[in-house]
Amino acid sequence: MAALLLRHVGRHCLRAHLNSQICLRNAVPLGTTAKEEMERFWNKNTSSKRPVSPHLTIYRWSLPMVMSICHRGTGVALSGGVSLFGLSALLLPGNFESYLMFIKSLCLGPALIHSAKFVLVFPLMYHSLNGIRHLIWDLGKGLSISQVYQSGVAVLMLAVLSSVGLAAM
């Protein structure tokens, strides 16, 4: 017990003595603060009228760029839609048939129903077909610029045609 007490007192005294020496020896006065550096950086950039890099205005929009953004967007929308559908099935009262009967009782026109079906099925078809395109790219096929544009147009046309066909069912 005495050994533990002696060890504790020795360490405590030694630590207090060394900490003051270490802190004083390594203390370096700061030349500028982070806020001053940040203000200097932004003043320099605004005075030279440089845009923040990479700036969106320097890029020319292309079909593959837009399709990549849309592929990500449809993926987020589809996963969000499936999650909302699952949560609503769990939390809302009644069953699926009662909600289907409610929609039928609204007497919506066929044009509105087909349009709604198209809006619901197009993101799924686009995301699926573009995903197949990406899988083909993963195999190392169709990576030349002309083939990328051709496959992009093909995906868009097939997505529209298949969505129209599925919405007509």
From Swiss-Prot:
Tell me which parts of the chain lie in the Mitochondrial intermembrane compartment.
93-112, 167-169
Name the family: Belongs to the cytochrome b560 family.
Signal sequence region: none
* Keywords, sorted A to Z: Electron transport, Heme, Iron, Membrane, Metal-binding, Mitochondrion, Mitochondrion inner membrane, Transit peptide, Transmembrane, Transmembrane helix, Transport, Tricarboxylic acid cycle
- Protein name, please? Succinate dehydrogenase cytochrome b560 subunit, mitochondrial
**Organelle targeting sequence:** 1-29
Q: Name one GO molecular function term.
A: electron transfer activity
Where heme b binds, per the record, is at: H127
> What is the purpose of this protein?
Membrane-anchoring subunit of succinate dehydrogenase (SDH) that is involved in complex II of the mitochondrial electron transport chain and is responsible for transferring electrons from succinate to ubiquinone (coenzyme Q). SDH also oxidizes malate to the non-canonical enol form of oxaloacetate, enol-oxaloacetate. Enol-oxaloacetate, which is a potent inhibitor of the succinate dehydrogenase activity, is further isomerized into keto-oxaloacetate.
Question: What does the subunit comment say?
Answer: Component of complex II composed of four subunits: the flavoprotein (FP) SDHA, iron-sulfur protein (IP) SDHB, and a cytochrome b560 composed of SDHC and SDHD.
Localization, UniProt: Mitochondrion inner membrane
Q: Does the keyword Thylakoid apply?
A: no
Q: Which residues lie on this side of the membrane: Mitochondrial matrix?
A: 30-62, 138-144
- Source superkingdom: Eukaryota
In the record's cofactor note, how is the cofactor described as bound? The heme b is bound between the two transmembrane subunits SDHC and SDHD.
- CDD domains per the UniProt record, alphabetical: SQR_TypeC_SdhC
